[in-house]
Amino acid sequence: MLQKCKLEGIIICNEKRLLGAAKVKSGRTLSGALLGTAILASGAGQKALAEETSTTSTSGGDTAVVGTETGNPATNLPDKQDNPSSQAETSQAQARQKTGAMSVDVSTSELDEAAKSPQEAGVTVSQDATVNKGTVEPSDEANQKEPEIKDDYSKQAADIQKATEDYKASVAANQAETDRINQEIAAKKAQYEQDLAANKAEVERSLMRMRKPRPIYEAKLAQNQKDLAAIQQANSDSQAAYAAAKEAYDKEWARVQAANAAAKKAYEEALAANTAKNDQIKAEIEAIQQRSAKADYEAKLAQYEKDLAAAQAGNAANEADYQAKKAAYEQELARVQAANAAAKQAYEQALAANSAKNAQITAENEAIQQNAQAKADYEAKLAQYQKDLAAAQSGNAANEADYQEKLAAYEKELARVQAANAAAKQAYEQQVQQANAKNAEITEANRAIRERNAKAKTDYELKLSKYQEELAQYKKDLAEYPAKLQAYQDEQAAIKAALAELEKHKNEDGNLSEPSAQSLVYDLEPNAQVALVTDGKLLKASALDEAFSHDEKNYNNHLLQPDNLNVTYLEQADDVASSVELFGNFGDKAGWTTTVSNGAEVKFASVLLKRGQSATATYTNLKNSYYNGKKISKVVYKYTVDPDSKFQNPTGNVWLGIFTDPTLGVFASAYTGQNEKDTSIFIKNEFTFYDEDGNPIDFDNALLSVASLNREHNSIEMAKDYSGTFVKISGSSIGEKNGMIYATDTLNFKKGEGGSLHTMYTRASEPGSGWDSADAPNSWYGAGAVRMSGPNNYITLGATSATNVLSLAEMPQVPGKDNTAGKKPNIWYSLNGKIRAVNVPKVTKEKPTPPVEPTKPDEPTYEVEKELVDLPVEPKYEPEPTPPSKNPDQSIPEKPVEPTYEVEKELEPAPVEPSYEKEPTPPQSTPDQEEPEKPVEPSYQSLPTPPVEPVYETVPGPVSVPTVRYHYYKLAVQPGVTKEIKNQDDLDIDKTLVAKQSTVKFQLKTADLPAGRPETTSFVLMDPLPSGYQLNLEATKVASPGFEASYDAMTHTVTFTATAETLAALNQDLTKAVATIYPTVVGQVLNDGATYTNNFTLMVNDAYGIKSNIVRVTTPGKPNDPDNPSNNYITPHKVNKNENGVVIDGKSVLAGTTNYYELTWDLDQYKGDKSAKEIIQKGFFYVDDYPEEALDLRTDLIKLTDANGKAVTGVSVADYASLEAAPAAVQDMLKKANIIPKGAFQVFTADDPQAFYDAYVVTGTDLTIVTPMTVKAEMGKTGGSYENRAYQIDFGNGYESNLVVNNVPKINPEKDVTLTMDPADSTNVDGQTIALNQVFNYRLIGGIIPADHAEELFEYSFSDDYDQTGDQYTGQYKAFAKVDLTLKDGTIIKAGTDLTSYTEAQVDEANGQIVVTFKEDFLRSVSVDSAFQAEVYLQMKRIAVGTFANTYVNTVNGITYSSNTVRTSTPEPKQPSPVDPKTTTTVVFQPRQGKAYQPAPPAGAQLPATGDSSNAYLPLLGLVSLTAGFSC
């Protein structure tokens, strides 16, 4: 079985058979071509780094920050780190791998010479196999092994020479030794026989002497054993008795110890309690002594000392008694126990008597209530108090009378001054009102002018900016146009010439039968990204892995073979994924091969579809594709399973593996483990290509490759149902028949079978075989092309059993093969633009359009604002008289308090320490009797020892001929390499954190080269740099002397080649090890939240290569960083709070309210940072771009604290009216961070960046800045929203906070004139006539406070300065809720509810001033989530003729707001005619001037009264009003 693997054209893969063996595709050349293509296509573009420029703007409040895909709101350098280049990925995947080695040569001349001589002496010489000393890595290990080998060669030579000499000497010595030994053997044997005869005679004599003393010894021994038994029994009895006595002693001793311990414990506790009690009594005595008279104290002290001496004497007697009893206890235990009992009884009786006595003393103390001396003092003080009280009362009465007289005079003068000032004020306010009205009109007109001017300026600046950009682009395009046009014309001319030449050869093999240029360049996209949408099911990567694992042989050999994948393993419920998951030879399968692209990395997403279901794939990040020279940005494919497919999977499922590279296409399979007859599988492909502007590309005869269409005896691969026109390649087996593209006339599998001219696979004996390979010269044999037009195209591709297309009669017969045999229902195909015909020219140049110069916009003419009129000068008012000062009353003397008398207490005597029992005497052990002495057995004379037969020395045999062996060694070395990563201060930063824009240096170090190495002819180091790393090539060259440095921008790789001088130094003495020098890469890291991983490759003499270790460093802003657990997004945060610390973001804020902005300086992600001093000196700043048009700074309230609540030191704050007003250093700092404040702003600056870094940054300590700002009063008059944003700037990198928006409600109080106090009656008689003596109301409608406001109301009042010459306040007013109110406890007060009881009024009728104020506790009880608005009705009576104007002031939380002005007129009343009984008479009552009003809770619908209590005229008010109404 074979899965075909190709990268170009429409590639179709299915089951193949070839004589029972696997069909192997030619892949070596293709792999090399792919590698070259990948190297050219995968360059990581570099971005120029300039602090003065950036890619985003934050000058407008609504401008979004670019680059937020990093998760960090960066204002400069916001881009996300690109994917690593394929070179970097491959290099790091092979980290520490080595290829080849450096051989080491050690001289063998000494050993060679030594091996020649031994044979002359008869010694055998043999050479062993060469010993491999291995391949070592460290050079010092090689330096160690070389002397070892050299020493061993010398040792082998010496051993050979020594073995030869030794053999010669051994042969001569052997014969002399043999003669000597034979002589010694004969002498020893004769002496032994003589000694043996003498010994035998002496043994007989000794036996006769030993038979006499034995019986006596045996009798003594028997008596000894009898005595021993008796003594042992006696000793055993004695020991038993001692043991019993010892046991009784141990028990008694333990009992006595316990009893004594208990007695001692009880004594010590009693003593401690007594001491504590006495200490308490002493303290009480000392306190009493301090409060009592000295004489009484001294008397009691003398008594105490007397009693104390007595107690101490008693205690001494007790101690003596205790000592006596203790001595008696130690003499006799039984008597002591009896005495102890008697002593205890006596002690307890004494203790009881003592307690009774103390109780009696306590009772006597309580009976004593006073002290005679203290009582006398108290009575004297009381008499003096009564005398002083009478004098004070008399003086205060006279003082009050004097004050009342002065007060009357003051009030009279005050009334006169106030009346005069009121008249002057009224005239002034009318003038101010007129001026303000005029200025309001001018201000509104000027505001409109400013808006029109600003809009005109903004439009102009936008047009001018766009014009300048277009002009720059125009100039650039104009400069480039001639070259582009010439290049395009040259290419078109070359294509035209090529097509003319091809027309001559169009009927020759391999040429397009209809010559055409290829306008579609679409061959390879390894970096493409794919997104999927499907009505089928997405599959998990783990499900694919499990399914491939059932192909055990290939899977165990790390080969992924889709052709063998069984679809049934993908049909489990838990195989379904919720999102796209990629699978392939990457990740944990890096290094595996696939039948799609051998060892190159392949990724694919998987879906499970049924007939008629689709998957739509969108391919982006295309790098290499063009149409007519114009970049292709996106391709969209819709893959649909053809409903007419005849595969036989019972579930109807088809697996689609959709490759991330769109030119690799799709693998489709319904294979369930069995070959199927009469089967087929087809996939419809609908596709659209898009240009760089996102517009569909309208193809005009673009060519799409149809390649590798195989036909065997039982299987046909084909294309059908396509939107284009088929173009045949001359000589190809592929044609078009019945709307299908396939090998129509012959098979094309094997030469000679079914008319095939070539074999699809390579055969060494067949020229032209192997056509089914992308790089085969005759790959056109199985290919064709389709010419496509229009934006939307389609083609269906698949594989089918031959029986579905042709009858058996139409099929060629191949001997030994069955045309109806089953096949796998699967296919791999791809669509791309690589046409297999020969010499097809490609269109690579886009036809340039002549640039058109843009038109410069005209600057607008701005309108001029009008000047405001001057306000009138406020008159000078008479100062009011100073109120009389009342002399303060004399203070009433304090009445003395009668004392409480105390008496001292006596000390309690200490308890007597008890006596203790004497411990028992331990028993004495009886000593054991001594055992009898055992009799001594008599000694016997030993028998003489017989002589020992001598050992005869063995005669040596002949000397054996030695074999001397020797061997040679071979040794190789693989010098190691090390990559190090340093900051600008040369500190190691591997697996650590440094700031964005930091300089990062990579040092490429190589170990010493060993002695005995071959000559070094080349020494090259290649470093594929990480994406987002900005190489400084010039600095790199300076830091790398001894190397030539070059940079390939396409692959983002820097290469170091040793100079001739460096090579000469390495080769100066090959017999000695040599140290290497190393180059250094210098550059900057440019991305937030990025990890920069890197290694390099060393290649020596093109024979030894090694890849280094991997180093990595991370920039802040990356969550879940395994190297830096504290790393996280850089998110400065801003929140608005009220004075109680409640967050008020988004809430309505009243004018005059202080916003407590809380700014978070987010530093926790920098914990453990290893940035260099150079970038630390760029500083640390926090910028608050506050709305100065709405807020006033409260710099006196600014606070900075750290995460632990401690005050932050070393940070200065400054505020600037605008960017232009800031110092140049601040402007430069903001410019580099790409931050443009809209107006005024604050800057918090770390005074000493290094100290700030050490204290807060490297420790990851977040800081909190509280910067209060008060809403300007004017905002309440106009209303409107204001917004606030902040920025933190760390290491020169800016990050934007969230935007905080609040709204200031417009407080717009209104005033009406009404005839009723009914809130439901909205009739307003403003501007109308009020009859003389008519009662009416001023309706004061307070400003509305919207719901969800930021802070509690604490002030809400109505101040009405009415014209008292025409209006008279009746003393009545009402307050009503204008909107529904919700209190904090949940109570709801409906609109229209009487709120008068929650108010209080102050009335000044003389000056026509009434102030109605809501009580603060009521206002604070209203929930901030509730709206608030109230209205007040002031009842008035018209008392004069004329026109009267009235305005009131609504005060809300300290800010005043003026209402509109109402005007009413009263004409002269008509003169009454003679009195007629039917005529109504008007009665006028003049109320007396009242006092300030304090309302009581409302009762029913009664009006509150503010006048004198004798307002008897009130019942007639209705009559008066009615009469007045008809009097004119």
From Swiss-Prot:
PROSITE patterns the record matches: AG_I_II_AR, GRAM_POS_ANCHORING
Q: Where are the Ag I/II A repeats?
A: 161-235, 236-315, 316-396, 397-478
List the biased-composition ranges (Polar residues): 83-97, 124-133, 1459-1468
* Amino acid composition bias (Low complexity), ranges on this chain: 51-68
Where primarily located?
Answer: secreted
Highest taxon of the source? Answer: Bacteria
Which chain positions lie within coiled-coil regions? none
Which residues in this protein are found as Pentaglycyl murein peptidoglycan amidated threonine?
Answer: 1506
Q: Could you tell me the membrane topology recorded for this protein?
A: Peptidoglycan-anchor
What is one cellular component GO term in this UniProt entry?
extracellular region
| Region: Disordered, residue numbers | 50-156, 840-951, 1459-1480
The entry's protein name is Cell surface antigen I/II
Q: What is the lineage of its organism?
A: Bacteria, Bacillati, Bacillota, Bacilli, Lactobacillales
Gene name of the record: spaA
